[in-house]
Regions:
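Alpha-helical transmembrane segments and their immediate juxtamembrane cytosolic regions
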Residues: 1-259
Length: 259
């Protein structure tokens, strides 16, 4: 008599793979909004705010494109809490911090030219850096946080200085979304042992981010997913996770040139 095979148990909630997929969707919305809607169709990367206002007045249909572009900006910010959360989870679960740091740093370097092409329409942009560089700084910040994990006054002051250093480096390097990503990583790190409060901490982090970028008012929506997180890795493809962002940027950047 053959044995009856019991069906594989599917964990309830949201695993890390699903968080990656949602982050990818939000990032795609942001890339399309800026590369196609803002730059290719409206030309916002080549005009001042006064010129944009005049262009919208001259062509009322442009208002619909502008509205869609702004909606994409809000959707893009929803990726930031998810990426910050995944970075904290990745740091806590990695078997080699050095290899993890090298992968993130490699992604930052590999993303720079495609990011410039998609966001600015040219390969070389000296005035800013892509957001992945903020994840590199945030990862180094977590490394030092864990080495001063005590609750005493001395350790607390050291962690404040470490956070301030990461914050200032993001400002000095002009990393896009850098300050907000560092804030979110720092706050989510505080909630690493308070699993029932992760969504609340994430919400507070996104509200703090609105001081630097008002579009983060919508990012709090993605923090709801933290509450459903089931601590499972899920079915992931590491190559996809790391190659997705620069590849999509490159494809969109090239396609936008033909619009």
């Amino acid at each position: 008599m053959s044995e009856r095979l019991s069906p594989r148990r599917i964990p309830k909630g949201t695993d890390a793979a699903k968080l990656h997929k949602w982050a990818a969707i939000f990032l795609i919305a942001g890339i399309i909004g800026r590369a196609f809607l803002e730059n290719a169709l409206l030309g916002m990367n080549t005009m001042t705010s006064e010129e944009l206002y005049a262009a919208v007045e001259a062509d009322p249909d442009s208002m619909w494109i502008l509205t869609a572009a702004l909606a994409c900006k809000v959707l893009q910010t929803c990726a930031a809490p998810l990426l910050a959360f995944l970075l904290v989870e990745g740091y806590q679960r990695t078997s080699s911090f050095e290899k993890y740091l090298v992968r993130i740093a490699g992604l930052a370097l590999g993303t720079e030219l495609p990011y410039n092409l998609a966001m600015e329409g040219k390969l070389l942009v000296l005035g800013s850096r892509n957001p992945v560089f903020a994840l590199v700084l945030a990862l180094v910040m977590l490394y030092f946080f864990s080495h001063f994990a005590g609750k005493g006054l001395k350790n607390t002051l050291i962690k404040v200085l470490i956070f301030a250093a990461a914050f200032l480096w993001c400002r000095m390097l002009r990393i896009e979304h850098g300050v907000c990503l560092v804030i979110l990583v720092g706050i989510i790190w505080l909630a690493r042992t308070r699993t029932n409060l992760r969504s609340l901490y994430g919400f507070c982090g996104t509200m703090a981010c609105t001081l630097f970028d008002f579009y983060y008012i919508g990012a709090c929506l993605s923090c709801i997913m933290f509450h459903r997180y089931n601590e499972e890795k899920g079915e992931q493809n590491r190559i996809f996770n790391y190659a997705f962002y620069p590849v999509v940027l490159l494809i969109v950047g090239i396609a936008a040139k033909f619009l």
